[in-house]
Amino acid sequence: MSIRKRMNVLFGTLLLTGSLFSQNVCVSTPETSLVLSAPVGGELKHVYYGDKLSEVDLQNINLTGTPDMPAYPVYGLNCPGESALAVKHADGNMTLQMEIVQVKTSKKENAEITAIELKDKVYPFYVNVYYLSLIHI
């Protein structure tokens, strides 16, 4: 097999593998879309916010690059900007490193509720992040 064919196979495998482990969550209204990267065991990251995306756009959003902006920044590791949450644990440590436990979506009347459960990797500290979107106005 030529080097070019091997590179194509490797690139295709990496794309497939990357999309298998990523879990995007889309919170949409009739006019807008918010896309979050929410892999279980990973960090909640902001992917896109803007005009409503089509199904094709949503399927291809992973091709736009790797999300690197935390959707819920916490005080401690890797948060040079403003934090959404800071705590002081019983031992005095203020570091948080939140990972996703689960993502649930439910519908209630004319709204869709997305609940993302986060937990600290070291301490028994949990946070639920909720997104509410109106389906029909």
Where are these regions (language model features)?
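Bacterial N-terminal signal peptides that target proteins for export
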Residues: 1-11
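Low-complexity, acidic Ser/Thr/Pro/Gly-rich terminal tails and inter-domain linkers that flank the onset
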Residues: 121-131
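Residues that act as N-cap/strand-start positions at coil-to-secondary-structure junctions
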Residues: 21, 30, 123-125
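Conserved small/polar residues in nucleotide/adenosyl-binding loops
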Residues: 135-137
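Short, low-complexity Ser/Thr-rich regulatory SLiMs
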Residues: 38, 131-133
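Bacterial N-terminal signal peptides
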Residues: 11-19
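Acidic-aromatic substrate-binding/catalytic surfaces of carbohydrate-active enzymes
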Residues: 24-117
